[in-house]
Amino acid sequence: MNKKILISTGGSGGHVIPATIIYKHLEGNFDVSMTSDLRGIKFLNKDEYNLRIFNVRPISKNLLLMPFDFILMIILIFKSIYFLRKNKINILISTGGYMSLPLCIGAKILNIKLLLFEPNMVLGRSNKFFINYCQKIFCYSNNVKKFPIKFKNKIKVIPALLRKNFYAKRDSNNSLDAINLLI
């Protein structure tokens, strides 16, 4: 039985594109699915991914809307717990951002292995919040700004993520016979 991996993403292309690359690298060996918010959908081909939409609103700074947003977040946490349990998820990979909060909290409650991915050189607030609970955080550098020193042992430095087709072997018989040199 393959392990079930859920990739939580959304928001900007800076979160979604790395999630799609991770998805494609894992899909042959694991049962992979992905969640995104509505903003992240525009970066995804829905037919290409096992995708579920979790529309998470940012918590408002408006004092009148804050209680409403808090109640919505509680509902989404329960929805996330139900989703994680129902789908028997073994590993949650979060690309950060507030859209991952309910699923990461659900994973923490259900004791599901949590892996974080930080696509930036400055540690994001969501990843900073969950750094204590995660097993590893994948970064492009050991020198991520605002990273707590006591959790440096959790960093796993990885090379820049590339789509699988960049690794495919090229047919050497298909090479160019002539080379144009522009001077």
Name the predicted role of every residue range.
Residues I7, S33-T35, L116, C139, ...:
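Structural beta-sheet core signal
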Residues R39, K108-R170:
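Active-site-proximal region of nucleotide-activated glycan assembly enzymes
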Residues T95-M99:
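Short His-centered aromatic/hydrophobic patch
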Residues S175-I183:
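Conserved donor-binding/catalytic core segment of Leloir-type glycosyltransferases
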Residues N2-G10, G28-L72, K156-P159:
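Conserved nucleotide-sugar phosphate-binding/catalytic loop shared by glycosyltransferases and other
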Residues N62-I91, L101, I105, I109:
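An amphipathic, basic-hydrophobic alpha-helix
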Residues I7-T20:
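A short, glycine/small-residue-rich beta-strand->loop->alpha-helix junction that serves as a flexible
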